[in-house]
Amino acid sequence: MMLSIIGSFATSPAEAAPSNYKFDFGNGQVEKGYIGVSADEKYDEKKRYGFNTPENMINVPASGTGVGSDAVEFLKFSTKSENTFNVDLPKGLYEVKVTLGDTARASVAAEGVYQVINMTGNNATDSFQIPVTDGQLNLLITEGKVGTRFTLSALEIDKLSHHPETNRTIYIGGDSTVCNYYPIDSSIQAGWGQLLPKFVDSEIFQVRNMASGGQIARGFLYDGQMEAILKYIKPGDYYILQLGINDTNPKNTTTEAQFKEYMREMVQQVKAKGATPILSTPQGRATDFNTEGVHSSVNRWYRNSVIALAQEENVPLVDLNVLSSAYFTSIGPAATLALYMNGDTLHPNRAGATELARIVAEELKRQGLDGFTGEEKKNQ
C-alpha cells in the first residue's frame, strides 16, 4: 500500500500530525499516491486516522474508475452522528475535496454540521474550506435522499493556513433555482448560486452555496443549513438569501406572514454575527410574457414581502425578479425559453443560471458591495 503524507512536524502530539492527506476508500486497488482505507479500519492514534465506529461501515463497489471504482458506505448517519471518519490535523484552515461513490443524492457533514448539500450522481466531487481547532477532522456522508446509499470514494485534505478561520465568504441560501448541480463544472441544469463564482473576485471571497432543491424558508432555518452557516459566518462575510418559490406551494402550508418572519429570523441571526445579509427576489417563469412581449412576474413568490423585509431590516436587496424580467424582455420570448431546461419553464439551464448570476453580481457591484465583478471569468 502506498502512502502519501505531506506535512510539517512539531513537538506536541497534535502538531506532529501531517497536514495533507489523500485517502482512497474501499477494499479495491489503491491508487498511486493515496492511502488505502477499508471500512473495518478503526481510528488509531498511531496512524492518526480511521473510522470512529467501523461496525457501522461497509465496503461497496462503485461504477467509476481509479479512486471512484470502490467506496465505503455509512450505515448510520446524520450531521450529529458519531459514525465519522476521523483524521488528526494540526490547528489551521483546510481545503477538503470529497469524491462520492455511487450515490443518488448525499450531503457531506463535518464538525457536526453540513458542509456540502445534496451532491448528486455517481462519483460527484466537491470541495470546501473548514477550520480545524481541536486537532481532529470528523467527517461523514449523510442525507441526502432518504433510502439511498451514502458513500465515500476519496478524500483529499490540504492545509491552507495556520489560522483556523475561513477566508471571506459569500454564503447562499435558496432553492432549486439557486443550488448546485453535478458535475459542478459541467452540469446541464444549474442554479445561479452555482455560477456566481464566475462573477466574484476569488482573491477576496470564496462562495459557499448551501441552497437545496425544494427548500422553503422554514426548512432552511430549522433543518441544518442555517446552522452550518451560523457556525462559520463572521464580519466581512455576505449571506445572500432567495426563497419563496416553494413557500407559495399550498402543500407547504406557509402563509406569507410566516414566510416573512422566517426570513426575518435568518436576517437577524446573520446581523448578530456581524455579517451582511442580502435578500433577493426569485426570477419568474420563462413564459411570463404578455401579448406585447413584456416579461413580468412581480406578483409571484411572495416578492412584496421580501422587498418590505429588506426595507424594514435595512439590508441590501437584489430585485432579481424585476431585473431578470427586464433582461428577458430585451432578448424576447424565444431566447428566454432557451435559457431554461427543456420542457421546464421554472428551472434555468447552465446558460440561464449564468445570466442570472451575472445580474445578481452586477446589481451588488452597483450598490457598492465589494468582491463582485462585472465580467464573467472564463476559467471557472
Predicted regions and their residues:
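Conserved beta-strand scaffold positions in the cores of enzyme catalytic domains, especially
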Residues: 22, 207-209, 314-317
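Compositionally biased, intrinsically disordered or flexible polar/acidic segments
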Residues: 17-183
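A recurrent domain-boundary module in secreted/ectodomain proteins
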Residues: 145-161, 359-380
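Alpha-helical cap/lid subdomain in secreted, periplasmic
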Residues: 225-350, 354, 358-369, 373-376
